[in-house]
Amino acid sequence: MREDNPNWFLRWEEELPSPEELIPISQTLITPHLALAFQIGSPNHHLGSKRTTAIYHQKLQSSTTPTTPTPTPPPMMMNSDFGGGDSTDLGSGSIGGEPARTLKRPRLVWTPQLHKRFVDAVGHLGIKNAVPKTIMQLMSVEGLTRENVASHLQKYRLYLRRMQGGNGNGITGGHVIVSDSATDRLFASSPVPAHFLSPDYLMPPLEHSYMGKHVITQQNQVVRNLRYEDSEYGHGSMKMLKLFPAGN
């Protein structure tokens, strides 16, 4: 048919509508009443174009700008304080990549009952030659350490020296002895054996190695004798005092 009419393209072009008859692309095909009924707002092409451009520039800027890592706050130190006082650190070091945490053991509180047990043990050994290890064995208190006994023994010897001097504070051997009211009240809760105040009993321990071994041998014999007596009258088992009893 196109071969029969060579001017078909010109006729088709003449039949096309003029630009004035064409509907602009920006014009909506929905009537205002219909758009209001369906709550359809008229699109704002300029506003959408501006938003798209702003988002594009924001993403481009974030990709080119180096990001600085957010500093993490240092981890807090976990301090477990049992007993409400000074305690001993058990160790340090990093565990699992975390910084060292201060671990503390329960603080020992010397009660009048515990001090009386200490005085009884020192009475068997003698205040002059009593050593912390043997005192700890005689006391037979679970949770009591050698350091606890050594510190208490030193304070008790100073207390006896103050009592021998007849004053609360004094000077012995060139050293000023300062009394502690709380410690003195604890020591006064148990009667002091009379022979503890003898000058011979307040002498320092023997420093000769042979004599020191001899004293330790005698103290070990005292421990064995006490255990034998306890087995005879206590049905074969020593009474163990628990310093930190477990909960029910």
Curated annotation (Swiss-Prot):
Phosphoprotein as UniProt keyword: no
Induction text: Induced by drought, salt and abscisic acid (ABA). Down-regulated by cold.
DNA-binding residues (ranges): 102-161
Subcellular compartments: Nucleus
Pfam families: Myb_DNA-binding
Gene3D superfamilies: Homeodomain-like
SUPFAM superfamilies: Homeodomain-like
Any single Gene Ontology cellular-component annotation: nucleus
Keyword list, A-Z: DNA-binding, Nucleus, Stress response, Transcription, Transcription regulation
Disruption phenotype: No visible phenotype under normal growth conditions, but mutant plants show increased tolerance to freezing.
GO BP annotations listed: regulation of DNA-templated transcription; response to cold
Primary location recorded for the protein, binned into one broad class: nucleus
Tissue: Expressed in roots, leaves, stems, petioles, filaments, stigma, pedicels, sepals, anthers, petals, and siliques.
Reported function: Probable transcription factor that acts as a negative regulator of freezing tolerance via a CBF-independent pathway.
Protein name: Transcription factor MYBC1
Species: Arabidopsis thaliana (Mouse-ear cress)
